[in-house]
From Swiss-Prot:
Family of the protein in this entry: Belongs to the patched family.
Ranges of compositional bias, category Low complexity: 159-168
UniProt source species: Mus musculus
Induction behaviour: Down-regulated by thyroid hormone T3.
TM spans (from-to): 68-88, 418-438, 440-460, 464-484, 529-549, 551-571, 685-705, 1138-1158, 1160-1180, 1247-1267, 1282-1302, 1311-1331
GO biological process: cell differentiation; cholesterol metabolic process; negative regulation of neuron differentiation; positive regulation of lipid metabolic process; positive regulation of neural precursor cell proliferation
Residue ranges, Lumenal side: 89-417, 461-463, 550, 706-1137, 1181-1246, 1303-1310
The protein's name: Protein dispatched homolog 3
Subcellular location(s) of the protein: Endoplasmic reticulum membrane; Nucleus membrane; Cytoplasmic vesicle membrane
Gene3D superfamilies in UniProt: Multidrug efflux transporter AcrB transmembrane domain
Amino acid sequence: MDSEDDPLLQDVWLEEEQPEDEACRGIPGPGLQSGAQGCWRRWTLPSRPPTLGFWSTLGWAFTNPCCAGLVLFLGCSIPMVLSAFMFLYYPPLDIDISYNAFEIRNHEASQRFDALALALKSQFGSWGRNRRDLADFTSETLQRLISEQLQQLHLGNHSRPASRAPRSAPRDTVATQTSAANSSERRRREAPSPEGQVTNQSRARRGASRWDYSRTYVSANTQTHAHWRIELIFLARGDAERNIFTSERLVTIHEIERKIMDHPGFREFCWKPHEVLKDLPLGSYSYCSPPSSLMTYFFPTERGGKIYYDGMGQDLADIRGSLELAMTHPEFYWYVDEGLSVDNLKSSLLRSEILFGAPLPNYYSVDDRWEEQRAKFQSFVVTYVAMLAKQSTSKVQVLYGGTDLFDYEVRRTFNNDMLLAFISSSCIAALVYILTSCSVFLSFFGIASIGLSCLVALFLYHVVFGIQYLGILNGVAAFVIVGIGVDDVFVFINTYRQATHLEDPQLRMIHTIQTAGKATFFTSLTTAAAYAANVFSQIPAVHDFGLFMSLIVTCCWLAVLFTMPAALGLWSLYMAPLESSCQNSCHQKCGRKSSLHFPGDLFTAPERAGGGPAQGPLPYLDDDIPLLNVEDEPASLELGDVSLVSVHCEGLQPTPDANSRGQLLAQLQELLHHWVLWAAVKSRWVIVGLFASILILSLVFASRLRPASRAPLLFRPDTNIQVLLDLKYNLSAEGISCITCSGLFQEKPHSLQNNVRTSLEKKKRGSGVSWASRTETTAQESMSTVYISKVKSKGHPAVYRLSLNASLPAPWQAVSPGDGEVPSFQVYRAPFGDFTKKLTACMSTVGLLQAASPSRKWMVTALACDARRGWKFDFSFYVATKEQQHTRKLYFAQSHKPPFHGRLCVAPPGCLLSSSPDGPTKGFFYVPSDKVPKARISATFGFNPCVNTGCGKPAVRPLVDTGAMVFVVFGIIGLNRTQQMDNHVIGDPGSVIYDSSFDLFKEIGHLCRLCKAIAGNSELVKPGGAQCLPSGYSISSFLQMLHPECKELPEPNLLPGQLSHGAVGVKEGRVQWISMAFESTTYKGKSSFQTYSDYLRWESFLRQQLQTFPEGSALHRGFQTCEHWKQIFMEIIGVQSALYGLVLSLLICVAAVAVFTTHVLLLLPVLLSILGIVCLVVTIMYWSGWEMGAVEAISLSILVGSSVDYCVHLVEGYLLAGENLPPQLSQDPSSQRQWRTLEAVRHVGVAIVSSALTTVIATVPLFFCIIAPFAKFGKIVALNTGVSILYTLTVSTALLGIMAPGSFTRTRTSFLKALGAVLLAGALGLGACLVLLRSGYKIPLPSGATL
């Protein structure tokens, strides 16, 4: 069989050539030069297909105009028909912007914890924080159930012992199952239903039952259903303290919330619950509910002698008093961070929610044209983005979010980043146009084949594999696939053009398909395999990305394989002569060559002297296959200690009319020649030694790369949405809602004349330590005016007088405004709000001896008056140390010169009486501004609701646990995600599946025995860390009556007033589920792999205990879960998936390279190069501070596939150089290796360098993406490309010059041997795995399970 008929063994050049006609001698091919038209006319088009041979038939088909046109038509129409079918009959593809796409949601640990979290959140809507005190309804229900059980026991019915129940539980949540309406709302990807949201409060407004609120939400009245929301988080910044509770920051927050309510269209979408009808000041806003915010406490309004806590006031109330009132409600802690407590009234952030109601005006109900209502709201709410983005100040950073705003921001960011892909695509398209000799025909079909392949890949991805969303990581495909596809296009074009020695069009086409098809198949196989390795990842985003990219690469190769040969056939017959004539015509009209025209000799080397056959192309621009013309005469190479023949290299010299680009490529090739001459010949051992040293160091550093310690960054760290996502991950700011937690619902309007709460109200407010009582006066009673006068004597400094009396005794004179003088200022005589700094006005007569001087002098000090120096107390007043609302800044100082008097002024220059630093007698303070007349200060300015006897006891908040809290759960089976259609940044985990056979009173004995067993295991549980049943009220005395096993249950070590983490779920009068909490000995700071052993110990011990229960008991379906387990498995499985992907990609590449090279000494340099490249790239990632996350996991497997290309191109060039080995070197293997290495670099060096530069330039737009995975992926690809080309030109050449076989040529026999060796190695590997499994060894899988 001839080599031209063998698709695997076909080398680049065919042996048979027909004698060329003199008229066409030296012409490279049709369309390549102006004279190409004459050769084209000599071709005879076959009128009928050849009778024998597959390749002959294929060559005829692609050179026949009708068949080639049909192939192009089918190649264009089939993808369009498939895509039209997909778009018309299948749901539209959307971008998967779910944050959970980076979590391993299908893992057992994640599903267990999500089920418990959702069961808890269905009542309160919160997980991850210390849950607050619930309503009395909870404990009353459980106490009723226990009473019924005890009555049955007394009546002789002992079959159902009852359980202890809590009266309140901040982390104890009594959950109700989500209603059908709630499930419907989740399917709509919206906020939870009102019935579920109504339970998101732990105490209702006084005087009404919290359960009465349900009537508000089920009403069909317009906008009474709180259905949408905007989340706001205000972060304090600008100083070291970062306390949000300062007057400046609170005023800023209040102004922002007012701007939101004043936004056009707000009243048509706002939430209008029935309760706000009682708030008279809200009438100007059409009774829209104000933001759910603490501003309702800080900015109350006064109307008709009553205080309304609605946040509509203009003046800031007393900050401390407002906080004391708000803290009496457990809901208060929803608004602040974890650090706030009774002793530390500081928070770094403040949360707020703006609620919007449904149904909208002109709609009968929420379900009435729901999609239309939703579209209207989405169009309205996105108008807030531009406004909110400008509200941050130097003191307050404003973060805005919510379901619709999150989705809008993600999609807008994604679309903006995708615009950068057009830059890469445009550059590549221009490059295609230039490299095809400005051929519009070839450029069009080259780009079209790539685009059409993307449509087919989308069809397979969406229809065949049934994936509904495109992952956000799939956007990288827009940058990568054009470069990959264009490489294949270039291969076919350049292969066809370089086959000028073949006169027969069919032979030329057969040669092109065989050579280019084989080369592109190999590179596409390794690339697709590298991406497909990520399909086994348990991270959904990584899995979808790997599948999508492997489909695109495969479809692109198939599209190019069929489209480009047909396009080349038609181009050579019809378009090439037309393009040449058009170019010649343009040149003649312009009188000179266009600067954008690249003549055909740019792609083919000039003729050699003597009119010999044309050489192959000098500027080798293909970056996938080496096209080595064995007819080229070898260049003259100086090999130092190797004696080689000298040959001519005229072919390397450009023709006189070659443009500057051709000269540049020739110079680059000459530079590479000298470089490799040094690397592969003179210093090859030095390079190998350096390579070995770097490899060892790289292995050491690469092994230190740690798994990701946090969820992956989706966006730049400083962007609004990423900061919000960080808060969600670290502060549990996930889809939590507290719609009735503000003062509007928690406080009834109070009379200004009666701020004292009744004893019953104070009893309901909390169970902690009472506030310290303070005696304070009102703002009107405590304010006074300090008047300043002076005496000015000639030759003596002015002496100032401070007085609370406006009269002016002689010789004092009034102070005139100007020059820093202060005639008077307002002060508080008692502490008021933030005016708590005490200053004293001291008077003295010492040192005033002159007759003209006044008899007294004054000064201001922060300390007591110094009687030893003659200073006596006159009066004192209170000021603020920081700027407040309606305040001004004043300075004071004491002179260090006689008579040592003091002075106050409005600017520092007037008070520079000494150069000493600020101290008790020098500094500044803030006083109420005189610009606001006393009459204009409202009744709410500085209003303290806790005056006199205080507001009652603050609600208790448990401390943060130091160890991992493990929950043992019964009554919950898992999660139902079958109907989940969630595509939000922060998604809904699904719905809880409860165990209907679970009966708490039937199993109470087994539960008590199990809790004792777990609590007694000191290796798992900390002493005093067992919380068997929810506690909080004094019902423990009933436990011993429920079952004998429940006697002497271990009690948790709780702080005074702190309640346990255990929880009980109640529905329809029965206990539905229960969770016992245990503080584990696991330390959260341990590594994931160390923590994994703790998980296994917990799992093993619980399984052992459950096996002791009777068969058929519902407790056998119990499980243990922990939030920490979920996090560590994300890291462990992410790393395992990356390693498996790396190994799988490496095995595929090794097998492909082995079959392709057919020699172990050619395979070894490639493998060593790949190992060095990957290790060095991972080491640089470690030095850069990166961790092994989702993006890095993707990159690791891709590195192998992309690193192998350049090395294999070099080896292919080495093999092809052996086809024309000089006879003088036949006896010297060392000289043969070095000569073949240099010949390979001479022919492929410019190509692979050009390919590397093109790849790096194509990834540059990725650096500027806001989506963090895009930017990091671009950096990794650029880094890997740079390291790959460096190692290829140094390490690979040196290794080939040392160990490659000197006279080896690829044959059919060597191919079969290599294929057999690969199959044998695979069989041995499979056999070894089976032996290990038989011997009891467990093989870990990417999913975290074991075989």
